[in-house]
Amino acid sequence: GEGWTKHVVEGLLDDVTQDGKVYGMPYAIEGYGFVYNKDIFEAAGIDASKLKTYDEIDKAFGELKSKIDKGELKDKFPALEAVLEFPVKEKWVTGLHTGNIALGQEFDSNKQAYESKTLDFKYASQLKDLIDLQVKYTKHANNPAALNAVDYSMSVGGGLAIGRVAAVQQGNWIYPEVKEVDQKLADRLGMIPIPLKGVSEGNI
């Protein structure tokens, strides 16, 4: 066998192994969650590094929204208008990433999902809660249809990177774009796990 396989994290090769033979090699790992501006959360008195569950995140986002709405952070963050931006126009964000959080819990592995003849969509209700959570903390909370026009560049380069929003559902791949806009801000980004309420919480 291949010598490198003994150095791989347990379980990582399950989906590319059949009849004891490994047919694939991992070459990159990406993480996604709520990428957030540490300075904004700290200024609001919120330790985002401790946020894991749906309820904790909802409460913290609610506290931050209240401070934004009252103008308490305006002096330090003049462009800040909302907790989140939700790029609904990007189907890979809503369909692939957000959807996978719910669908991934239905199967023990990618292989099992591939071979399955049915999809029960057991966690549809929790997925709706997750989507509603994100909508609730955008500037379009009262007009969700407007989110259909929000794309990647509006949420990252024109959102998080300029301090217009405090967080966005994205992954570690946004760092170079944020760095191009604001190096200091890019170096102060963190990631909060995206929770599937009562099912999978605290995972990136």
Residue ranges and their predicted role:
Residues K52-D58, A146-A161:
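Short helix-initiation/N-cap motifs at beta->coil->alpha
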Residues G1-E10, D15-T17, D39-G45, K52, ...:
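Extracytoplasmic "Venus flytrap"/periplasmic binding protein-like
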Residues Y32-Y36:
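Short glycine- and hydrophobic/aromatic-rich loop-to-beta-strand nucleating segment
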Residues E42-A44, V181-I204:
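Extracytoplasmic/periplasmic substrate-recognition and gating elements
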